[in-house]
């Protein structure tokens, strides 16, 4: 029964994400936003505001270099983390500070942070929406990736 409840919450979150963060076609108002982040609170069923997010890019020597930082808005989103020119082919890591978020709500979480590591723009320039569905003891992530752009 607990599995079914968790699955339903996860699926509801995915439906919410698909409705709340539609892809904007290349060349429109959102064309300068090649990387967007969206965070949802699965416990409260709402966007997760003020979640600190760090983005790192993997260097040739295998180390992680600071790339971008931000905090989610009241809508649980961060736009304009980078520009088209800066967001080149490579391996990136998006780190969500989940511990501070849950502690700010008076909860004691299991994870210190959640991260997503992915390869970007390896088969043409794309736009990425990285979404995270958070709870104090679990998290799930998904990505919406546009078709290659010219």
UniProtKB/Swiss-Prot annotation:
It is found in: Secreted. Transmembrane segments: none annotated. The modification Sulfocysteine is found at residue 33. The keyword Transport applies. Detected in serum (at protein level). Detected in liver and choroid plexus. L-thyroxine binds at residues 38, 77, 140. Residues 1-20 form the signal peptide. One of its GO terms (biological process) is protein tetramerization. This is Transthyretin. It comes from Gallus gallus.
